[in-house]
Amino acid sequence: MDRGKRILTCLYIKRHKMKTQKILLVGLTILSLSFTACTDDGFCVKGNGDIESMDLNLEEFNSIELMESADVVITQGTNQHVTVTGDANIIDLLETDVRNGEWSIELENGCYRNYQLDVEITVPDLSQVSLSGSGHIYVNAFDNQNNLDLSISGSGKIELERFRDTRNLDVRISGSGDVIGYDKFDQLQNLDVRISGSGNYDAYPIEVKNADINITGSGDCYTSVSEILNVNISGSGRIRYHGSPTVKKNITGSGSVRKTD
């Protein structure tokens, strides 16, 4: 091939490569704009403003998982009963399947914005409450629940009040969520709190005999312990306690443990 043909061939390849790069750039730009539109409510379902209440007939459950931005109230009663209140078009999309004794409060797959969803639950027994995201759960007035497990992943909040004869309380917080206790747990023996992130366990009123507190990150724990307090902190976490327990601590970082009463 002579020199002129080689030059023309090189120019063609260079122009074809530039054209391909432009096509890819345009495609990526369109994809980015489409994603932005989705996150900016372009493809999200919004509440229609038609507020209604509905009773749900569900299989029996003693474990509850909240996976949406909703307000949930859980109380104890002889018979199970569930009432939901909110935008009619949102309630229609609520999942109602119970699997292995657990009801996951979630909407069908999709994007949702600007809606109301309130759930009132009455159950005879409660073993586990989980929250993912920014929802709010209030648990009130339970008797004779030997073990209660609570977990938060995200920025949500779980509030507790009026528990009697609960022996063991396990709390798991991942993220910036809060567990707040407003009232004494009669007969509570053991407390196990594990915080990963900046979440808080704020429950001075909940008195316990023995507590294991593990914090990784900057979380805070406020508790009342009478006998043994085991502490593990990695980071800047803080533990403040009432009572006169024997304290065993292992701290890595700037974290601290302090008696405050």
Ranges and model annotations:
Residues 1-17:
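Short, Lys/Arg-enriched N-terminal segments with co-localized hydrophobic residues
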Residues 6, 20-29, 36-91, 104, ...:
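Short acidic/polar N-terminal linker immediately downstream of export determinants
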Residues 56-64, 76-81, 98-100, 121-129, ...:
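Short "repeat-start/strand-capping" segments in structured domains, especially the N-termini
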Residues 93-97:
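Glycan-recognition/cleft segments
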Residues 111, 140, 165, 175, ...:
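A general structural signal for short secondary-structure boundary/capping elements
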